[in-house]
UniProtKB/Swiss-Prot annotation:
The active site is at 117 (charge relay system), 148 (charge relay system), 231 (charge relay system). The lineage of its organism: Eukaryota, Fungi, Dikarya, Ascomycota, Saccharomycotina. This is Pro-apoptotic serine protease NMA111. Nuclear serine protease which mediates apoptosis. Its EC number is 3.4.21.-. It comes from Meyerozyma guilliermondii (strain ATCC 6260 / CBS 566 / DSM 6381 / JCM 1539 / NBRC 10279 / NRRL Y-324) (Yeast).
């Protein structure tokens, strides 16, 4: 991804975006070197004489390349490619890895000038690469609160093989018609040289959209140079080699580029060089440069216009107040539409003059003279400190991040610069799946949070696992107050810390605010009232109390393991044992046991739950709650001992998309052997080797949860949801809604009735799929076996064949089954359906008769212990989440390269910056083999911080690769989550 060229959608409206990807290099179609005066290609012009000399016709038209060559030779030795990461969300910016351009402005001290949107407002880590491919670590030393420039610093001693050149800043040399070159990392190509001519000096700052960084209160320079992503921070140089401007953005629909004048960067550089504080003043007013004709329409008098034109003959307009922020220094004094005439007696016609005056008068009262509706009015306004309304700290807690509201955001929506801003609405503060930032907190647990300090004190008083109400607004809809209840989770994500920017070191210093949260409050017994299902038909009255067997199950999965794509899910489960407190629920809603579970009764009472069992094949989980805490009349339903058959009728009770109870008379249309399709790009758990019930009811497909029952209330099947593949554009996950026969679950239910959780369940580590008799004949099944099948099959006559064989886990023996084997019998019994394989759950091995390549084989097939299938160890390292390959991975791969599987990575971490791919396997660290997570941790915890290490990886497609990764333990410490005696424990490894 390449940050850099932030381009407008067109040259006339204030819409813009950053180009975040490499842009293919295309030969420009408007190169003046190859066009005639009419703009047509010069293919038919005799450009050169027969002696090889340039024709007189074009002698003066071509630029003097010799002088430019000398200039460029010097410039390229000052230009650097910046490889960087914004490691954390902060203010308007999200964590990201990117590249851009900068150039040396002080070779002795190692100062580099680049854009503010490159340095970023938050934590920054990066390095620069010089023209000779030497690199140096850089640290940010200044980022301007408003204008799009910042400074990085490197150690000049790190560059040993090249003389570093520096560019002098000469903003005064930027003139209309000046020929310029933009030298930088255009389109991520490290070095590109783009030509153009300055066409404007007085453009208003481009607008890149709301909730994004925007420059304002400054002129921009315009030129046509066709720069693209990665060119941000490039020097704009004239023929003499002076930097006359700084590349910042451009149009997305034209070749137009926008450059920042370097007046304020020059002043900031001089302050840094002299060890002085860079003062920045502001009155919280956004000005726009408007032409004189528009100023007249807004109330500028002819006399004032004449005076301005006389004083500034080269100017085309004046500054007009576009926005006055509430509660700012100018609030109640200046108004939108006021035309600025002077400040403290100094006539004003440019942003540069305003900056020069305000920056030197912070804290002072200045006299502003404006024209309003044909009248001249003056006000005394105290200049505020711009740094004081620019956040320089943030708080991490409960998986989310917060900072004080910034001037940047407040200006976009014309709101006061105060409040707690959610820059990363994740974890407990995930208020919308679509909007991660832009929220302002007003109350937490009914206590006001006017600023970050007040918010910290409120959060310190809230126990772990408590549910509290919050009041909040979105800055884009400030009229609407939102109130909701959140779950404060601080056991999976225990961090509660303050990060403060340290300009002397360039890093952000962390301070732990609270080592441990207050202990969770103990739940108390509660009662709830159920409302039964009303029926006019007395024959169905036995189903009226089935709602007493349903509970709502809410899941929070804070750690993205096993490639499960969701963090929060809501579904319904069935109480299969009310006396002992057991609930059966789809693994679509409870994917693994690394989550918090809440069981809600009668839409009224909520109790904590715990995952105690995960079926490896049949897509259901068992959740336990404490029945002593539920005083309501929860019912254990009756269970049938007869499997449903095709054509049978049943009564459907389910919960639809609105979580409302619906009912329907249904008929079983099919009972089929099914495997849920795979999500190949992100392998995850899915139901396999299933015998599923399909219905002819449209209503059932609107329900994620439910049951099939007889009219007397006896349960025949559970209606559950199966998570399947991802659609073609990777935006949505396909789900399947099917029935699971009660008889297929009864062995587990009987154990639960004895208050025993099934343990030691065993399975065949292979997938089977149905095959028609016709296909079996073609593949060599003899008539003898076909006749046996025809004698015993009652419904569909189909064989089962091995569809896929899982890769064995470390230390496991591979199954003798092979893809394509057609199963005839198991332990002497003919296999007609998936249900006939159910004997595997309590057998160490099974005797198979299969047809393979038209030959009959007798195989003894071992089963595997499923107690090791569930994830029990997770490692967080350099922004990546590592775990042993879960069962969904092993089902789709032939061989496991190692037990270190990359399941997720942070967008701003070293793992993303240096190319650790998700769904890959780490096999070696510094050429030391690391087969397991334990061996990996043992090696990396001895590697110092800020050190390059070599990793060898193998992709999911078995392609080996070697990369180098630089550790960053300050922002991305190494820690583990490990399941010990049924409980998860966290261990941090400090270097």
């Amino acid at each position: 991804m390449t940050v850099g060229k932030r381009k407008l959608s067109n040259g006339t409206v204030n819409e813009a975006k950053r180009l975040d990807d490499h842009v293919p290099v295309v030969a420009p179609s408007t190169n003046p070197d190859f066009e005639n005066a009419n703009g047509e290609d010069n293919e038919d012009i005799d450009d050169y004489s027969s002696e090889g000399e340039m024709s007189p016709q074009l002698e003066n038209y071509f630029p003097q390349t010799t002088s430019w060559q000398k200039t460029i030779t010097k410039v390229v030795k000052s230009v650097v490619s910046i490889q960087f990461s914004h490691v954390s969300n902060f203010d308007t910016e999200s964590s990201a890895v990117s590249e851009a351009t900068g150039f040396v402005v002080d070779s002795e001290r190692g100062y580099i000038l680049t854009n503010r949107h490159v340095v970023g407002p938050g934590p920054f880590c990066g390095y620069v690469v010089f023209d000779n491919h030497e690199e140096a670590v850089v640290r940010p030393i200044y980022r301007d609160p408003i204008h799009d420039f910042g400074f990085l610093q490197f150690d000049p001693k790190d560059i040993r093989y090249m003389k570093i050149e520096q560019l002098d800043l000469r903003p005064d040399l930027a003139q209309v018609g000046t020929e310029i070159r933009v030298v930088g990392n255009d389109a991520g190509e490290k070095l590109s040289i783009l030509a153009g001519f300055i066409s404007r000096l007085d453009r208003n700052a481009p607008d890149y959209g709301t909730l994004s960084y925007n420059d304002f209160n400054t002129e921009y320079i315009q030129a046509a140079a066709s720069a693209s992503g990665g060119s941000s921070g490039s020097p704009v140089v004239n023929k003499e080699g002076y930097a006359v401007a700084l590349q910042a953005g451009g149009s997305t629909e034209a070749s137009t580029d926008f450059f920042l004048p370097v007046y304020r960067p020059l002043r900031a550089l001089q302050c840094i060089q002299q060890g002085q504080t860079i003062t920045r003043g502001d009155i919280q007013v956004e000005w726009q440069l408007k032409p004189f004709d528009e100023c007249r329409r807004l109330g500028l008098t002819p006399e004032a216009e004449a005076a301005a034109r006389s004083q500034f003959p080269d100017k085309i307009g004046l500054l007009v107040a576009e926005l006055v922020l509430p509660e700012g220094p100018a609030d109640g004094k200046l108004k939108e539409g006021d035309t600025l005439i002077s400040i403290n007696g100094t006539p004003i016609a440019s942003f540069i003059s305003v900056d020069e005056i305000l920056d030197e008068q912070v804290g002072q009262s200045l006299k502003f003279v404006i024209q309003r509706n044909g009248h001249e009015v003056s006000f005394d306004i105290v200049v505020g400190d711009l740094h004081s309304i620019t956040p320089s700290r943030y708080v991490d807690i409960a998986g989310a991040s917060f900072n004080d509201l910034s001037y940047q955001v407040a200006r976009c929506f014309c709101i006061p610069v105060r409040g707690v801003f959610i820059n990363d609405g994740s974890g407990s503060f995930e208020l919308s799946p679509f909007e991660k930032n832009g929220w302002l907190l007003e109350y937490v647990d009914d206590k006001p949070t006017p600023n970050l300090d007040a918010f910290v004190e409120v959060m310190k008083s809230i126990p772990d696992r408590k549910k509290v109400s919050i009041s909040y607004r979105h800055v884009s809809d400030f009229h609407t107050e939102n109130i909701t209840v959140i779950y404060v989770e601080r056991h999976w994500q225990s961090t509660f810390r303050m990060a403060v920017r340290n300009d002397s070191t360039g890093i952000w210093d962390f301070t732990d605010i609270q080592d441990k949260p207050l202990p969770a409050e103990e739940p108390v017994p509660q009662n709830a009232k159920y409302i039964d299902i009303p029926f006019d038909d007395p024959e169905k009255s036995g189903c009226s109390q089935l709602t007493r067997s349903f509970v709502q199950v809410r899941t929070i999965a804070p750690v993205p393991v096993d490639s499960y794509p969701y963090r929060r899910e809501i579904g319904y489960g069935v109480v299969v044992d009310a006396a002992n407190g057991y609930v059966l629920v789809s693994r679509r809603f409870v994917p693994h046991d690394m989550c918090d579970i809440f069981v809600i009764f009668a839409e009224s009472v909520e109790l904590p739950g715990k995952v105690v069992f995960l079926h490896p094949n049949q897509n259901y989980a068992i959740v336990k709650y404490d029945p002593k805490l539920m005083l309501a009349d929860v019912k254990t339903p009756k269970f049938s001992d007869k499997p449903l058959k095709r054509g049978e009728r049943a009564f459907f009770v389910g919960y639809n998309y609105n979580l409302r109870v619906v009912t329907d008379d249904v008929k079983v249309s099919s009972v089929s052997s099914i495997n849920v399709p795979v999500a190949s790009l992100s392998p995850r758990y899915r139901g396999t080797n299933l015998e599923c019930i399909l219905l002819d009811s449209k209503l059932s497909q609107e329900c994620d949860s439910g049951v099939l029952a007889d009219y007397d209330g006896t349960l025949r099947a559970f209606w559950i949801t199966y998570l399947g593949e991802t659609n073609c554009d990777q935006t949505n996950d396909r789900v399947y809604r099917m029935g699971l026969d009660v008889t297929d679950v009864m062995s587990v239910i009987k154990s639960l009735h004895e208050n025993k959780v099934p343990a030691g369940l065993r399975i065949l580590d292979a997938e089977f799929a149905s095959m028609t008799i016709f296909q079996g004949r073609l593949r060599g099944v003899p008539q003898e076996w076909i006749s046996k099948f025809e004698e015993v099959c009652e419904d569909e006559m189909k064989f089962l064949a091995v569809d896929r064989v899982s890769a064995p886990a470390l230390g496991q023996v591979a199954t003798p089954l092979k893809t394509g084997d057609i199963v005839m019998s198991v332990n002497g019994s003919i296999v007609k359906t998936m249900r006939d394989l159910g004997i595997m759950y309590n057998q160490d091995s099974l005797d198979f008769v299969v047809i393979r390549q038209k030959k009959e084989l007798h195989l003894n097939v071992p089963t595997i212990d499923t107690s090791t299938l569930n994830t029990s160890h997770v490692v967080f390292w350099c922004g990546s989440i590592l775990q042993a390959p879960h069962h969904g991975v092993r089902q789709l791969i032939e061989k496991i390269p190692s037990e270190i599987y990359v399941t997720k990575k942070n967008s701003g971490g070293p793992a993303n910056q240096y190319g650790i791919a998700t769904n890959s396997f780490i096999t070696h660290v510094n050429d030391t083999e690391t087969k397991t997570l334990e061996s990996f941790v043992s090696v990396v915890k001895g590697i110092p911080d800020n050190t390059y290490i070599k990793l060898r990886l193998v992709s999911f497609d078995s392609i080996p690769v070697a990369i180098s990764v630089k550790t960053n333990y300050h922002y991305f410490p190494t820690f583990e989550l490990k399941k010990v005696n049924g409980e998860w424990e966290e261990t941090e490894h400090k270097v």
